[in-house]
Swiss-Prot record:
Protein name: Cobyric acid synthase
Keywords attached to this entry: Cobalamin biosynthesis, Glutamine amidotransferase
Function, as annotated: Catalyzes amidations at positions B, D, E, and G on adenosylcobyrinic A,C-diamide. NH(2) groups are provided by glutamine, and one molecule of ATP is hydrogenolyzed for each amidation.
Origin species: Saccharophagus degradans (strain 2-40 / ATCC 43961 / DSM 17024)
The family this protein is said to belong to: Belongs to the CobB/CobQ family. CobQ subfamily.
HAMAP family (UniProt xref): CobQ
Length: 485
């Protein structure tokens, strides 16, 4: 019989994703077959699975922690916001349709069936399923038809741990308030609390823990310390910028679109010792960069208009006049062409708009969505290097610019470059995950003697470090008595 434990949080970014990853790694190295599961995820950072679908990147990292390949059953419902009130709905890894919030609310009963189908399939394959909730279970306006938090826990009858982030303050109010807002049956299934990101002397916290346990009649199952410089992929929030400590560095700037997607593409750059990396927000300038990267977006036309409203198109033109380099990824590639056509109204009311015009091709948005994991060779310097990545897009780009490709995948060309070699563009995400490719791209951008950073190995090290910390401060055998050592 499969053991299921659900992690819910008092807020978004309380530490749910991280704790699930830690538990998956701890159990996996005990020889237990464990899988992560998130019924519903709302995120613009996604991953392509081996079965050809799309899930949240958080679940992909959790699968890595568990030592298994990511699968669409680990995140059966993925919502990718495209406007303030609407999102693309991904079911079992495939795009279903764009829905407004009220339409999705009506769809939840159907969505719950998809969630349960995936969960039951995982039950047949794994000894333990560690489930991650979404946001907070105490959102009163979202309680009806809930499939992401207590609605799921009640349906499958699983115990729940509630985690809260003490570093942000108000941890006792968050925990007590969340518990108070749950129904009686939901309160009963809460087996305890975890306090995350604690700094300082634990002795000073103990009176508060005693009060919390007496107030709620729930145990504190662990206090996870603030883990300095823990580098795992961020699912939602943009992570902090970095500044290179090396005297020789490359200044890379990335404009933050309103619907920026897959910003985890840049995590390896943030950690590279020779890169001065920064996201550039509204009202900030792109000037002074060596390399400007135009990232992916869930709404290319809207974010192209946003780019122009910020004056970034003018700054990009100046950057190129002075010899700067530009890389366009996915939606960023589409912006660099001469025109974008949306005849089916996929991103916006049916229309055509002018692109930035730096590369000779046009993009037409189609109802078919490309989802691919890829390996190939990057051809931007004298010597081709191995590269891996993935595609997630709903556009078809064609034109003379693609006669100058930058990647070959199984003999097929991909991407394009300008005649003067200042601009390159590709649909591939994950360009910087492979050390040789990162080294080549930084060299193309002007960094001599660029070092190789093995990002995949770094994530493995970080997952192990995280698991070690969590295992020291939580009684894992008590949580999973069936598998106690």
């Amino acid at each position: 019989m499969t053991t299921t434990l659900m992690i819910q949080g008092t807020t978004s970014d309380a530490g749910k994703t991280t704790l699930v990853a830690a538990l998956c790694r701890i159990l996996a190295r005990k020889g237990i077959k464990v899988a992560p599961f998130k019924p519903q995820n709302m995120a613009l950072n996604s991953a392509v699975t081996e079965d050809g679908g799309e899930i949240g990147r958080g679940q992909a990292v959790q699968a890595q922690a568990a030592g298994i390949a990511p699968h669409t059953d680990m995140n059966p419902i993925l919502l990718k916001p495209s406007t303030d009130t609407g999102a693309q709905v991904i079911v079992h890894g495939k795009a279903l349709s764009a829905m407004e919030a009220d339409a999705y609310h009506d769809y939840k009963k159907v969505a719950m069936q998809a969630v349960l189908e995936s969960y039951r399939r995982l039950q047949t394959q794994y000894q333990v399923i560690v489930v991650e909730g979404a946001g907070s279970p105490a959102e009163i306006n979202l309680r009806e038809g809930d499939i992401a938090n207590m609605g799921f826990a009640e349906e499958v009858d699983c115990p729940v741990i509630i985690i809260a982030d003490i570093d942000k303050g108000g941890v006792f109010a968050h925990l007590v308030g969340t518990l108070e807002l749950l129904s009686a049956s939901e309160q009963k299934r809460v087996v305890g609390f975890v306090i995350n990101r604690f700094r300082g002397d634990i002795e000073l916290l103990k009176p508060g823990l005693t009060w919390l346990e007496q107030k709620t009649n729930k145990p504190v199952l662990g206090v996870i310390p603030y883990i300095q410089k823990l580098h795992l992929e961020a699912e939602d929030a943009l992570t902090a910028n970095s500044t290179a400590e090396n005297t020789q560095h490359l200044k890379i700037r990335v404009p933050v679109w309103q619907r920026i997607s897959n910003h985890t593409d840049f995590d390896p750059l943030r950690l590279h010792p020779q890169v001065d990396f920064a996201f550039v927000g509204p009202g900030q300038s792109l000037e002074g960069a060596d390399l400007i990267i135009l990232p992916g977006t869930k709404n290319t036309i809207a974010d192209l208009n946003f780019m122009r409203s910020q004056g970034w198109d003018t700054q990009l033109a100046k950057h190129l006049r002075y010899g700067g380099k530009v890389l366009g990824i996915c939606g960023g590639l589409q912006m660099l062409g001469t025109a974008l056509h949306d005849p089916h109204g996929i991103e916006s009311p049916a229309s055509s708009v002018n692109g930035l015009g730096y590369l000779d091709f046009e993009t037409t948005f189609t109802q078919h969505k490309t989802l691919l994991n890829l390996q190939g060779e990057l051809h931007i310097n004298d010597k081709p290097v191995a590269i891996s990545g993935y595609e997630i897009h709903a556009g078809l780009s064609t034109g003379p610019a693609f006669q100058r490709p930058i990647i070959y995948c199984e003999g097929q060309p991909e991407g394009c470059r300008s005649a003067d070699d200042q601009i390159i563009a590709t649909y591939w995400h994950g360009l910087f995950s492979q050390p040789s490719a990162t080294q080549a791209l930084l060299a193309w951008a002007g960094l001599t003697n660029a070092r190789a950073l093995d990002y995949s190995a770094l994530i493995e090290t970080e997952l192990t470090r995280l698991a070690d910390e969590v295992e020291q401060c939580m009684d894992i055998d008590a949580l999973f008595p069936t598998f106690a050592s």
